[in-house]
Swiss-Prot record:
The chain crosses the membrane at residues 23-43, 59-79, 99-119, 158-178. This is Derlin-3. Residues 1-22, 80-98, 179-231 are cytoplasmic. Residues 44-58, 120-157 are lumenal. The gene is DERL3.
Length: 231
């Protein structure tokens, strides 16, 4: 019964958040069970473009390392801030949300080539947190009960964790940079004098993912109108 309740709760999570979180968990579980190897997942341009192992363009965003503190920490922030974006500023705009993932993924992959980065899931997490924080400037965040600050400081606070653990912050900086590019092109530049939206979601994504808009001028035919017994 507990599993049924958990499954019901999970199915109530918005589609993009649910799909991405599940893909990350399943990928990590497959590696933990030795069904997959990280060497089959990491981004390698030679293997992608010469050996046509195109799945690496996606799988490098799904693996967050072995089960442990870092994995659960990343999953917590992926689930929380991806969901808040999808239920907040992207509510009813699934296609736009997916396009943000695609834009961020492509830009991170191109920039990751310069830094020889093999796994970019943490960068994607940083991008999600950054975009949410810039769109929620008045929200106060309680950081693990230790600090309280305004939302725009959250991405920088998160970057302090790998520094404390002695890890590189290059991936986090990449995610913040890509998040800022998206935020600027989507939220800042269109509101400037002479500015316009440069990031336009392809129409085929809208057809696939968004519910069709109702025509306000549409009048139902008589047989479509509720009768006395239906009212």
């Amino acid at each position: 019964m507990a599993w049924q309740g958990l499954a019901t709760e999970f199915l109530q999570v918005p589609a993009v958040t649910r799909t991405y979180t599940a893909a990350c968990v399943l990928t990590t579980a497959a590696v933990q069970l030795e069904l997959l190897s990280p060497f089959q997942l990491y981004f390698n341009p030679h293997l992608v473009f010469r050996k046509f192992q195109v799945w690496r363009l996606i799988t490098n965003f799904l693996f967050f390392g072995p089960l442990g503190f870092s994995f659960f920490f990343n999953m917590l922030f992926v689930f929380r801030y991806c969901r808040m974006l999808e239920e907040g500023s992207f509510r009813g705009r699934t296609a736009d949300f997916v396009f943000m993932f695609l834009f961020g993924g492509v830009l991170m992959t191109l920039l990751g080539l310069l830094g020889s980065l093999f796994f970019l899931g943490q960068a994607l997490t940083a991008m999600l947190v950054y975009v949410w924080s810039r769109r929620s400037p008045g929200v106060r965040v309680n950081f693990f009960g230790l600090l309280t600050f305004q939302a725009p400081f959250l991405p920088w606070a998160l970057m302090g964790l790998p520094m404390l653990l002695g890890n590189s912050i290059l991936v986090d900086l990449l995610g913040i940079a890509v998040g800022h590019v998206y935020y600027f092109l989507e939220d800042v530049f269109p509101n400037q004098p002479g500015g316009k939206r440069l990031l336009l979601t392809p129409s085929f994504l809208k057809l696939l993912l968004d519910a069709p808009e109702e025509d306000p001028n549409y009048l139902p035919l008589p047989e479509e109108q509720p009768g006395p017994l239906q009212q």
